[in-house]
Amino acid sequence: MEVDVDNQADNHGIHSALKTCEEIKEAKTLYSWIQKVIRCRNQSQSHYKDLEDIKIFAQTNIVATPRDYNEEDFKVIARKEVFSTGLMIELIDKCLVELLSSSDVSDRQKLQCFGFQLKGNQLAKTHLLTALSTQKQYFFQDEWNQVRAMIGNELFRHLYTKYLIFQRTSEGTLVQFCGNNVFDHLKVNDKFDKKQKGGAADMNEPRCCSTCKYNVKNEKDHFLNNINVPNWNNMKSRTRIFYCTHFNRNNQFFKKHEFVSNKNNISAMDRAQTIFTNIFRFNRIRKKLKDKVIEKIAYMLEKVKDFNFNYYLTKSCPLPENWRERKQKIENLINKTREEKSKYYEELFSYTTDNKCVTQFINEFFYNILPKDFLTGRNRKNFQKKVKKYVELNKHELIHKNLLLEKINTREISWMQVETSAKHFYYFDHENIYVLWKLLRWIFEDLVVSLIRCFFYVTEQQKSYSKTYYYRKNIWDVIMKMSIADLKKETLAEVQEKEVEEWKKSLGFAPGKLRLIPKKTTFRPIMTFNKKIVNSDRKTTKLTTNTKLLNSHLMLKTLKNRMFKDPFGFAVFNYDDVMKKYEEFVCKWKQVGQPKLFFATMDIEKCYDSVNREKLSTFLKTTKLLSSDFWIMTAQILKRKNNIVIDSKNFRKKEMKDYFRQKFQKIALEGGQYPTLFSVLENEQNDLNAKKTLIVEAKQRNYFKKDNLLQPVINICQYNYINFNGKFYKQTKGIPQGLCVSSILSSFYYATLEESSLGFLRDESMNPENPNVNLLMRLTDDYLLITTQENNAVLFIEKLINVSRENGFKFNMKKLQTSFPLSPSKFAKYGMDSVEEQNIVQDYCDWIGISIDMKTLALMPNINLRIEGILCTLNLNMQTKKASMWLKKKLKSFLMNNITHYFRKTITTEDFANKTLNKLFISGGYKYMQCAKEYKDHFKKNLAMSSMIDLEVSKIIYSVTRAFFKYLVCNIKDTIFGEEHYPDFFLSTLKHFIEIFSTKKYIFNRVCMILKAKEAKLKSDQCQSLIQYDA
């Protein structure tokens, strides 16, 4: 007897997630569904011999029913006699006619998922269908004909018109082909059907409901309009503090800031009233509290007039010793070459202001302008700690609402207190917390940010990742003068604003913005193109230069894929590309007997600035890698929300919008092709990046000619204008670094040059006696050559140097690495003066963060294991809700991100895999300890949690260790590790975490005890099992 159980295919990734949604009544594989049909007909599966032939196909198709589906309809039709005559196309036409003639609007909406679009008035007697996509082809597969033969025409028609049908790709994504668009379930219901205390809320009664108190945005708005909108519950990003070059010579807030604007014309109370409205908008608070808040703001407006910014800035953040003399000497050298000024750049970049000094200046400001009773005692100390934390945050970190409010007790704030009964105290206390949150948010997002912008330039540094550095504006002003003098000699020319305005009108772009990233002895100029484009009517549009180039960018992505696939040149674009080529080379090298290898690495100097724009334009127009026309396809992608955890013990279905989030993504398809969405996803080189998602193609594909997409790219490269320090400049050389298309353009340009000069490296020989096997890769500007012939390596260097001289670019010869000595007779040609300048590598070759063993070709990541280097890449952004889940996700990301290739037998060894594990455990361990410290600090005063914190931190280590090992064994092809390695793996993990947590034993003493006890138990169990085995 057949049993209807959910087999392995029924519990596959996103399919399981689909079952958890309220809108989906049932979701099965087609295989399980046919078994259900068989049971309904009281037949044996032996009558359906063809089912086993299509089992794999049937298990990769999912059929789901909406929640309003009537199961009885299925049973009635399933028991009817089976007829499967006629052609599939005729049957599908009948289904379409049935849907068109239906009076139910939802039936006609199903046409969208079938690849059609309804045209004409819905009240008309006839309708027109236009093809959206090729999804209708999906049902013309032989397997579907076999399914139709098994279940009959009538049941197939029912399946086609009433079910949602998905096909699963090899990456676990479900592509929808039938039924109402699954994305319709994400739409927010406009009707407010949630009951409030005292009866249902009245939609026609504005601002009457008690729940609207803290959520209205204007006089006419009310809570009901915003029930599903998370209003103002989070801090804004700190990005405003970065890269502000405006130099305020008055040593106060900028003139337009509300703290100093109109200070002589409008009274402090009136200005305070305006600021209060800006902070609280139209949300209601009790009158006495409102008056107190306005009074506090007015007090701050009065006190800021007397605050001596210059004195406290000099006191807290002094300029370097003898700054005036140093400044004058450096400014006298502005017109020297960049190389001659390198030591002065190094000196200036070292003049960072310590975070403690910045914190002290901000705290001095608030000590002087805040009313003394605003925050007192412990509350004041905790506020100052939050200022310190805010200053120390990395570039992508921010303080969440709960972290901003924690440890500040509103009951200790005298001016917020109110006399009330114990019964009503909760409501007033809740209001006080809300008011304090709004005030603190305003203080940090407006005052703290404005103070930093006025007096400091904030930036990251090269190779320091997201760590932030503060420079006094006086120092940064000198850096800008020196850098712009260098840039004007190299790539920029100053222009008048009138020329820029004409350029904006003619080409419709917005000028970019230039910023500088400090390096050790120089700087890296980065252009950003986030400014909105102003149209001919002088109205600001929603488009930026990058978004305007979106379709062109999609077209160039097909060029990138063709370059890698054909191949053309030697460019690679990501680590997956690198590892594919590397693995192919290692296999060839092993086939020819693992002969001696020769290594060479080179680096293009100023890669983007060295691109010849005229040649690039010619290359783009004449290349055969670009099709003459393109289709732009738009896909709707439904992704799981990563922070949602399903409780298997207390499971209940929720709405789809609670589990999933949607986004739209576009992809370009070459004009000579018109593949289905499924075919696109099965192509390894597709750019949709849709793994384990739900996806639908629900819009008509747009047609474009190559020339129309290419011209905007050529225009912006040849005529690029930027804004820097209040002046406009035109780029005279190279392509913009920071434009969305620049990396592909640069790679294509150098690949075209490589084709004519380095093609000899493709002539390989697999003769074991004289093997000639080569691997050449270039990631942006970094070359790596591994070859079995020393002559190839020498010729490679000489050819590239010749190409660079012919095309006006240079190689940084200081970064030239070889595994063999170069001929002294060619030093002058290579740009070297002596033997000492040769960089001969031994044992390991380092390239783009990968260390390669030069004898075995085994790999391991090149991870900085200094504590400072480890922590500068850490972004905490702690979540106070489900914090243990946040902690677990953090540890998983530290250990399991981008590590797949380092544990495959085909390209590494067990010894190197263990070295990689050691590095991951050290790096991940220190990051995890920092996160655990944040977690512990947040909950240590929570009596219910405090006793469990250390145990939770330890449990997460156990859980993630098991998940990590399972991932290494089950998810990696040709993995180094097997199940037999698990005991040693777990013990090694515990050993590393014990050592790391022991460095902060005064905080994590109990964690160390728990981990040591677990280690001892594992060793005891291991010994016990060995004794039993011997016996």
UniProtKB/Swiss-Prot annotation:
It is found in: Nucleus; Chromosome, Telomere. One of its GO terms (molecular function) is telomerase RNA binding. Keywords: Chromosome, DNA-binding, Magnesium, Metal-binding, Nucleotidyltransferase, Nucleus, RNA-directed DNA polymerase, Telomere, Transferase. Mg(2+) binds at D603, D781, D782. Residues 498-852 form the Reverse transcriptase domain. GO terms for cellular component: chromosome, telomeric region; telomerase catalytic core complex. InterPro entries: DNA/RNA_pol_sf, RT_dom, Telomerase_RBD, Telomerase_RT. Belongs to the reverse transcriptase family. Telomerase subfamily. This is Telomerase reverse transcriptase.
